[in-house]
């Protein structure tokens, strides 16, 4: 370990590591409840391209887990496996196991639509439907057969409040959602995802296209939501991973190099590859 990581306030990528020294008891994976488990997992885009190699990972319940690593390392591919978004790729196949609360996500009898209700996803670019703000949030509920206006009203308000958006849109719920700012659209998409009460929320670089103020609101929202949901976030932003996550996984060339509580991984990584990445030597 170089001298930089032994300073009282070591820095990685220009980041003050005191950001992640929260003054709380160090997290220990053995004390956590497992939500998602990955066992000897391989993913192939086709017969010639293997994107994930022998991944073993436990993601704890109601914590924020960040996936970091250089572009092309497999972090978004792994994220999309959790709700089988990669099923849409012709020729893709998997080996190994991926479990959600001990149930095999890739089991023969799994209803993929139900899985995607349980495991919601928010993408890098906000994708509101060309409908009203209200109907964006109510959409998933209507698909599930909810018709009661009273129930819909209640869930829409609750979801928008949870997404820290209610006060900004409560007087214009009938307006088209595409008229919202980028940051508001992303929070609306999160509200839409949590309206159907998923167990897990997957966030694929949710703030990368947003301005700093909108990014901060998304990060604050992630922190608030982890009391109710297991959250997995892919990010290229090292500072963001440090600020919002409890655990961090570093990936490189399709392999999981290191996983641990965020404070330890950033300040005292076990693997040289991890240290090289977080200190900016490559990536």
Swiss-Prot record:
It is a peripheral membrane protein. GO terms for cellular component: plasma membrane. Its main location: membrane. Residues 36-278 form the ABC transporter domain. Its EC number is 7.3.2.1. PROSITE patterns: ABC_TRANSPORTER_1, ABC_TRANSPORTER_2, PSTB. One of its GO terms (molecular function) is ATP binding. InterPro entries: AAA+_ATPase (IPR003593), ABC_transporter-like_ATP-bd (IPR003439), ABC_transporter-like_CS (IPR017871), P-loop_NTPase (IPR027417), PstB-like (IPR005670). It catalyses: phosphate(out) + ATP + H2O = ADP + 2 phosphate(in) + H(+). ATP binds at residues 69-76. It is found in: Cell inner membrane. One of its GO terms (biological process) is phosphate ion transmembrane transport. Keywords: ATP-binding, Cell inner membrane, Cell membrane, Membrane, Nucleotide-binding, Phosphate transport, Translocase, Transport. Pfam families: ABC_tran. PANTHER family: ABC TRANSPORTER I FAMILY MEMBER 17, IRON EXPORT ATP-BINDING PROTEIN FETA-RELATED. Belongs to the ABC transporter superfamily. Phosphate importer (TC 3.A.1.7) family. NCBIfam families: 3a0107s01c2. The complex is composed of two ATP-binding proteins (PstB), two transmembrane proteins (PstC and PstA) and a solute-binding protein (PstS). Part of the ABC transporter complex PstSACB involved in phosphate import. Responsible for energy coupling to the transport system. This is Phosphate import ATP-binding protein PstB 2.
């Amino acid at each position: 370990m170089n001298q930089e990581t032994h300073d009282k306030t070591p820095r990685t990528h220009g980041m003050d590591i005191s950001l992640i020294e929260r003054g709380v008891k160090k997290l220990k994976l053995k004390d956590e409840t497992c939500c998602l488990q990955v066992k000897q997992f391989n993913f192939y885009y086709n017969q010639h391209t293997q994107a994930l190699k022998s991944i073993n990972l436990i993601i704890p319940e109601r914590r924020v887990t960040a996936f970091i690593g250089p572009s092309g390392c497999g972090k978004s591919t792994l994220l999309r496996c959790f709700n089988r978004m990669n099923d849409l790729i012709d020729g893709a196949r998997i080996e190994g196991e991926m479990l959600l609360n001990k149930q095999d996500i890739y089991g023969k009898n799994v209803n993929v639509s139900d899985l995607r209700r349980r495991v919601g996803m928010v993408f890098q670019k906000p994708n509101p439907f060309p409908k009203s703000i209200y109907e964006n949030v109510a959409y998933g509920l209507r698909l599930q057969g909810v018709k009661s206006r009273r129930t819909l009203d209640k869930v829409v308000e609750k979801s928008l409040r949870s997404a820290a958006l209610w006060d900004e849109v409560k007087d214009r719920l009938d307006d088209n959602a595409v008229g919202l700012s980028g940051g508001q659209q992303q929070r609306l998409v999160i509200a839409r995802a949590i309206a159907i009460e998923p167990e897990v929320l997957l966030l694929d670089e949710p703030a990368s296209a947003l301005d700093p103020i909108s990014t901060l609101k998304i990060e604050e929202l992630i922190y608030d939501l982890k009391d109710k949901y297991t959250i997995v976030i892919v990010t290229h932003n090292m500072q963001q991973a440090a600020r919002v996550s409890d655990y961090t996984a570093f990936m490189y060339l399709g392999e999981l190099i290191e996983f641990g509580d965020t404070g330890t991984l950033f300040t005292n990584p076990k693997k040289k590859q991890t240290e090289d990445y977080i200190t900016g030597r490559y990536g």
